[in-house]
Amino acid sequence: MAAPVDPREVQSLQTYLNQYTQQAEVYSRQLGMMEEGIREANASIETLKALAEAGEAPVFMPIGGGLNIRATIIQPDEVFVSIGSDIIVQKTNEGAISYLQDRIKEMEATAKNLTEVLQKIDAQVKDIQKRLEQLYRQAQAEQQGAGSL
């Protein structure tokens, strides 16, 4: 006969399950931000390429609130890149594309790491859920056995 179900073990497993679930939510949000950053960088690369081909052609420039104004890009090969801490550097169009491609590689590596962590957490969650199910079945069997006496 198996040892009786220890309520402390059940409570401990529930706590771990809650913690892992919260961690998974945080990592999932971070992964979503990485994926959004990659999409945004790819869109910026496409825009820079189109601007280089168009030269000094008029474009619609968003100004917020769903509004755009018609503008002419005077120097499409001058791109100003924010590198953080309110620091902006001037790059050529190709330099900006190269910078974005490097950032994409970094974000893809981070996304890969986050995915691996999420997979490990998911495996741990499944193990805990399996153990909890075993304990619940065992507790039910104990109750049924005690009720038949």
From Swiss-Prot:
GO biological process: protein folding
Location(s), subcellular: Cytoplasm
Single GO MF annotation: unfolded protein binding
Keywords of the record: Chaperone, Cytoplasm
Membrane-spanning intervals of the chain: none
UniProt keyword Signal, yes or no: no
GO cellular component, one term: cytoplasm
Cited Gene3D superfamilies: 1.10.287.370
One Pfam family this sequence matches: Prefoldin
Domain of life: Archaea
Coiled coil location: none
Biological role stated in the UniProt entry: Molecular chaperone capable of stabilizing a range of proteins. Seems to fulfill an ATP-independent, HSP70-like function in archaeal de novo protein folding.
PANTHER family for the chain: PREFOLDIN SUBUNIT 5 (PTHR12674:SF2)
Subunit structure: Heterohexamer of two alpha and four beta subunits.
Family from the record: Belongs to the prefoldin subunit alpha family.
UniProt protein name: Prefoldin subunit alpha
Gene designation: pfdA
